[in-house]
Amino acid sequence: MYAVLVTGGKQYRVAQGETLRVEKLEVEAGNEIKFDTVLMLGDSDGIKLGDALKGASVTAKVVAHGRADKVRIIKFRRRKHHMKRQGHRQHYTEIEITGIAGGDKK
């Protein structure tokens, strides 16, 4: 069984036992988290699809928090002797999917 969930403004296709990195969540490492915004559920019988499936949820365990590799940004203006360098490291939360519960379409 798989599901498509929404967190941090992004959509992720997940299955039980998978590990993935999502935008930073304010949950301590080792705790469980429940995602209620599930857009799609699929299995061998078919799929359930909708804006949000009523009663559907995905539970996950927070494995760790971290920061991604640095992305370097350079803004350059030719012939003006101007160059601006900037770096950014995005915070993320690594989660492991522990369960997918089905539901009815809203």
Curated annotation (Swiss-Prot):
- Tell me one GO biological process term: translation
The domain of life for this entry's organism is: Bacteria
Asked if Cell division is a keyword of the record, the answer is no
| Keyword terms, alphabetized | Ribonucleoprotein, Ribosomal protein, RNA-binding, rRNA-binding
Q: A GO molecular-function term, please?
A: structural constituent of ribosome
Query: Which GO terms of the cellular component aspect does the record hold?
Result: cytoplasm; ribonucleoprotein complex; ribosome
Task: Please give the NCBIfam families that the UniProt record associates with this protein.
Answer: L21
- Describe, as the record does, how this protein assembles with itself and its partners: Part of the 50S ribosomal subunit. Contacts protein L20.
Quote the function comment for this protein: This protein binds to 23S rRNA in the presence of protein L20.
Family affiliation: Belongs to the bacterial ribosomal protein bL21 family.
Protein's name according to its UniProt entry: Large ribosomal subunit protein bL21
Origin organism is Xanthomonas oryzae pv. oryzae (strain KACC10331 / KXO85)
Which gene codes for it? rplU
